[in-house]
């Protein structure tokens, strides 16, 4: 079983913001896999389905970003899934808009959602797909920046990155993470 967690904040006012790219990737996967992500369980919107022979759980935590670990620890304990089969997708200010990066494990850096997850799981030994949202301009508040929407001139690049992130996660599930990293970490 694979658990794919997209990080974001619940509520209309956060839709399509930089901080919610994880939710956007889950929406793409849900459509692609014909999985309805509408059931409320484990402080999250979840949907279960199959990708090939693999059972897949798509997850959009509803706890707000900084408490995302509460959702994931509940799911981890309930489903008894291997850490290597938990894939977290989230925004990264250290990557330019349009870029993605896949890692088998590692720190969450300055990302508060990832800090919450690694703290609650007691490990950072799980795959993650980072979607570039770029850095704020000099003097711009980081919180305001990540809660902002993409500029019109960024829309093609971010849409391409979201599709690429969904394809990379599909590759992780259908093939393996090493193949996905070779294919998408360019």
From Swiss-Prot:
List this protein's GO terms for biological process: protein quality control for misfolded or incompletely synthesized proteins; rescue of stalled ribosome
Segments traversing the membrane: none
EC number per UniProt: 3.1.1.29
Gene name, per UniProt, is: pth
Native species: Clostridioides difficile (strain 630) (Peptoclostridium difficile)
Site residues by UniProt (Discriminates between blocked and unblocked aminoacyl-tRNA): 9
Q: Where is this site: Stabilizes the basic form of H active site to accept a proton?
A: 91
Q: What is this protein called?
A: Peptidyl-tRNA hydrolase
Q: Which family does it belong to?
A: Belongs to the PTH family.
Residues at which tRNA binds:
14, 64, 66, 112
Query: Where does the protein end up?
Result: Cytoplasm
Describe its partners and assembly state: Monomer.
């Amino acid at each position: 079983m694979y658990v794919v967690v997209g990080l974001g904040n619940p509520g209309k006012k956060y839709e399509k913001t930089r901080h919610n790219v994880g939710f956007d990737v889950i929406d793409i996967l849900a459509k692609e896999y014909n999985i309805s992500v509408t059931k409320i369980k484990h402080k999250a919107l979840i949907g279960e389905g199959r990708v090939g022979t693999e059972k897949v759980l798509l997850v959009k935590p509803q706890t707000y970003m900084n408490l995302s670990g509460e959702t994931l620890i509940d799911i981890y304990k309930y489903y008894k899934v291997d850490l290597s089969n938990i894939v977290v997708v989230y925004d990264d200010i250290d990557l330019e808009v349009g870029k993605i990066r896949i890692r088998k494990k590692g720190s969450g850096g300055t990302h508060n959602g990832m800090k919450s997850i690694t703290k609650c799981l007691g490990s950072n030994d799980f795959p993650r797909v980072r979607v570039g949202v770029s850095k704020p301009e000099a003097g711009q508040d980081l919180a305001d920046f990540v809660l902002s929407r993409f500029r019109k001139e960024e829309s093609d690049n971010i849409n391409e990155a979201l599709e690429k992130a969904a394809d990379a996660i599909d590759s992780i599930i259908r093939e393996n993470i090493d193949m996905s990293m070779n294919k998408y970490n360019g």
